[in-house]
Amino acid sequence: MYHSELFQQYGTSYTMRPPHALAPTYPSAGGHHDSYRYSELDVPSQRFDGLFPALEPSQRILGAPPLTPLSLPPGPALGFGQVQPPCETPQLPGNVKMKLENKELWKQFHSIGTEMIITKSGRRMFPQCKVSVSGLEADGKYLLLADLLPVDNSRYKWQEDHWEASGRAEPRLPERVYIHPDSPAPGSHWMKQPISFHKIKLTNNTLDQMGHIILHSMHKYQPRFHIVRAQDVFSRRWGGCSSFTFPETLFLTVTAYQNEKITQLKIQTNPFAKGFREDGMKSKRDRSIRGKRKVISVEQEQEEEEQFQPEGECKRPPLYSGPCDSTLSEELDIGRSLGIPSPNCSFHPITPPTQTPPSTETPNPSLPANQEQGAPLQMSSQTPGTFLQTYPEPPRGASSLYSCSPTDAAQNQTLRPSAQRLPPGYQESPHISHSQGELKIYGTEMGPPGNFNPPSCAVTPSVRLSDEPMGRGFSMNFPHFLPNNKIGLQISGAQLQRMYNGGGWM
């Protein structure tokens, strides 16, 4: 629009210019909406009829309408909880039959009330669905499908010893169809042997992306099987479909078995539950564990009895039990192989009767040099601190307890510890053989208290000359205090100084 007072030369109004006339060869307006057909491209349909026998005549020429998407045969609209009837048209020939192979097993479960476990990750069914078919064309292509339909519109609960309805069912979930992995296959393949649907997995995960069949817990479901002819799969019509159901296969979905009879029946019939049987591996493991526990309890009772036995009847403890097992582990291992006589009761130090030094008497030749004569020592419990307080100073004649000589001191200081051998004055038992790994390290002889120049000295007792206990107050039942043995107690000079100056043991 424009203002008439500004453009007076155009007047108060004006008319539109008429449209230009189109050329006579220009297509009419109807040609813009209808597809243009070139006659030279039209192909006679009868020329290629033999190549496409399954295609419809409307699809054999160019310009035919596009194919519709492939879909299952349409069925009637169903309300909530209504069972979908099997597909009606088209039907396979009436001679196509399906039979449930493990029907007797299903009947056993059905008489009690079959329960199927469902999990988030998916659980297989037992009993499995095993069917056999007959009446198919040997050369025809067929697909076998399976799905699960809700039986009614109720939710169930286990009440004492039976199932009963407890309310309305949950809203129906998207129905999923399980396609047998052998599909499509010729009819001869399906009819030659039973068909198993053991790979079907049930889940309660509504967001499952693994293709498992989604079900609600505590609901009744009915498996349904379909045989679909797949020869004309690219056509707008299916070749035929037949559906089959078996009343014995009805089951309830649970997350844990509610009926104890179902649990026992599945243990007896499921080959994968052999471990739960009385003769199964799980029962054997349980029995073996119970047996081991009994043995352990008996051993514990024996140990408790040994701990409360009197002193005269107590047995020798193991070499690694005692106050010195942490520092003499290697020496005790050597002493075990030397046949050292065992002590009468324990390794605890005894109370010294007197503070007199050991006497020297002629030993009894009828006894070995490394065994005690007379009655066993009376053992009494005493702490190491009390024992050291009794002997603040070394006893008289203590120099005979050490195998160090002044002449060997300088040599031992210059030699490496690995090269220091037994001193010349040491008499070794002829029954004991030498070995490279059983060497002793010796230092020099002890001097007066406080003058301990050598860095270390091996305490080794001299040969006994009397049948009295050597060094009264010293337990001669220790392996490292026995004469003519190969065990040397490595003690540094500073430790010996503190020991005899009253500074405490070690």
From Swiss-Prot:
The entry's note on the tissues where this protein occurs is: At gastrulation, expressed in the lateral and ventral mesoderm. Expressed around the blastopore except at the dorsal midline. As gastrulation proceeds, expression extends anteriorly and ventrally. At the tailbud stage, expression then retracts caudally becoming restricted to the tip of the tailbud.
Gene Ontology MF terms in the entry: DNA-binding transcription factor activity, RNA polymerase II-specific; RNA polymerase II cis-regulatory region sequence-specific DNA binding
Feature: compositional bias, Low complexity: 357-368
The protein's matches in CDD domains, at most eight in alphabetical order, are given as: T-box_TBX6
* Basic and acidic residues composition-biased segments: 276-289
Pfam families xrefs: T-box (PF00907)
Annotated region described as Disordered, given as residue ranges = 276-411
UniProt entry keywords in alphabetical sequence: Activator, Developmental protein, DNA-binding, Nucleus, Transcription, Transcription regulation, Wnt signaling pathway
Q: Which GO biological process annotations does it have?
A: anterior/posterior pattern specification; cell fate specification; embryonic pattern specification; mesoderm formation; muscle organ development; positive regulation of DNA-templated transcription; positive regulation of transcription by RNA polymerase II; positive regulation of Wnt signaling pathway
Question: How does the annotation summarize its subunit structure?
Answer: Interacts with ripply2.2/bowline. Associates with tle4 in the presence of ripply2.2/bowline.
Name by which UniProt lists this protein: T-box transcription factor TBX6
